């Protein structure tokens, strides 16, 4: 997904000055974060906040940990927090040396805005996977915007789709696919590990059907809906 690099300041210097580990990128702000398990202690990580509301966490719980691009809910589970499913309060950042839940910071501003907009539209698309025709490995596609939906739509329509066609990163068949424990997290707003419900499975809308596509699915939809 392409973002407008450096298009605006996500947070003011005053809002970030007391937060530990701040790094400001072209299209994101990154901070130190963590989640505490009463049994295993603190799992420390890096949280990236994007202007479109996306939150990505790279875990640093051990030097050998390779978990990255986790959702906060997935990171909460990975840290083996005993009382999970409340990542807004369980995932924290350091502010003036104290652990402060994300819910009590400004860092969820864009996430909450995106969530509010998605609830208004009532069109939620969970992440989907497309398998490589060569190696069989499955690659994740996010379906949050019309452009992302089109990339996924074109990928599943191509019988010879390969890892090298993946639109987000330059990858080959040598790259490992996501672990099964991560695949269950597909972006449902009701339940992080949802297997498919009426809130995250769409059977056709103006976001994921295209008037310039000649597949039967799009043709059936656009004959009964005004194209956008």
UniProtKB/Swiss-Prot annotation:
Q: Name one GO cellular component term.
A: nucleus
Question: What keywords tag this UniProt record?
Answer: Cytoplasm, Developmental protein, DNA-binding, Nucleus, Transcription, Transcription regulation
For this chain, the annotated S-S bridges are none
Tissues and organs where the protein is expressed, per its UniProt entry: Expressed in influorescence, pollen and siliques, with a higher expression in influorescence.
Domain (SAND): residue spans on this chain: 14-121
Q: Does the keyword Coiled coil apply?
A: no
Its localization reads:
Cytoplasm; Nucleus
UniProt main location, coarse:
cytoplasm
Q: Which GO terms describe its molecular function?
A: DNA binding
Chain's role: Putative transcription factor that acts as a key negative regulator of cell accumulation in shoot and floral meristems. Negatively regulates the size of the WUSCHEL (WUS)-expressing organizing center in inflorescence meristems. May act by down-regulating expression of WUS. Can compensate for mutant ULT1 protein when overexpressed.
- Matches recorded under PANTHER family: PROTEIN ULTRAPETALA 1 (PTHR34053), PROTEIN ULTRAPETALA 2 (PTHR34053:SF3)
Q: What is this protein called?
A: Protein ULTRAPETALA 2
Q: Which organism is it from?
A: Arabidopsis thaliana (Mouse-ear cress)
């Amino acid at each position: 997904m392409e973002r407008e690099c450096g298009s605006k300041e996500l947070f003011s210097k005053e809002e970030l000055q007391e937060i530990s580990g701040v790094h400001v990128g072209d299209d994101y702000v990154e901070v130190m974060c963590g989640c505490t398990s009463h049994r295993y202690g603190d799992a420390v990580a890096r949280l990236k906040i994007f202007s479109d509301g996306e939150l990505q966490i790279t875990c640093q719980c051990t030097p050998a940990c390779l978990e990255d691009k986790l959702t906060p809910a997935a990171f909460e589970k990975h840290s083996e927090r005993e009382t999970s499913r409340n990542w807004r309060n369980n995932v924290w950042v350091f502010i003036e040396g104290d652990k402060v839940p994300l819910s009590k910071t400004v860092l969820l501003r864009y996430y909450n805005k995106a969530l509010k907009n998605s609830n208004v539209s009532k069109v939620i698309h969970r992440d989907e996977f497309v398998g490589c025709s060569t190696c069989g490995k499955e690659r994740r596609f996010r379906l949050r915007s019309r452009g992302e939906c089109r990339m996924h739509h074109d990928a599943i329509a191509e019988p010879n789709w390969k890892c090298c066609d993946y639109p987000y990163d330059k990858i080959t068949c040598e790259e490992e696919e996501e672990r099964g424990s991560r695949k269950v997290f597909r972006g449902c707003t009701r339940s992080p590990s949802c297997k498919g419900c009426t809130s995250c499975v769409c059977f056709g809308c103006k976001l994921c059907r295209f008037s310039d596509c000649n597949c039967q699915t799009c043709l059936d939809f656009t004959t009964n809906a005004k194209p956008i």
